[in-house]
Amino acid sequence: MTIRKFHYLILFITIIAICSLFRIKDRVSTLNYQLRSVIKQINSENNNINILKAEQAYLLLPTRLEKLAAAYLKLEIVKSYQMINDPLAPNIEQNIKFNHNISISKSNKWRYKRIMNNKYIQTVSSRVK
């Protein structure tokens, strides 16, 4: 009797192993199909990106834009009486200190210093000989 139970146990384990392997194989084939589908979509989008880049390069050609501006905008040269100061721009001329005694020569050292908001200003120092 114990041999018969052992055979049933082996048969049951074999059936479970076969079912598990079939399920794993089916899952792997499904994932491979999905992977190929995603790769095709990526390639298609890369092709679309390249087409859009080429179209953008064509649309932004300076000669083409110049022709379109001449044909449709009828622009004229800006005259000095048409220009105004920007009322929203900060008045930075108050903050500028300039030493008129500095002569521009090769002995001057030009440096850039960081100020607020990661902006840089250009400074000069000269050596007096």
Curated annotation (Swiss-Prot):
It is a single-pass membrane protein. It comes from the Bacteria. The chain crosses the membrane at residues 8-24. GO terms for cellular component: membrane. It is found in: Membrane. Keywords: Membrane, Transmembrane, Transmembrane helix. This is Uncharacterized protein RP568.
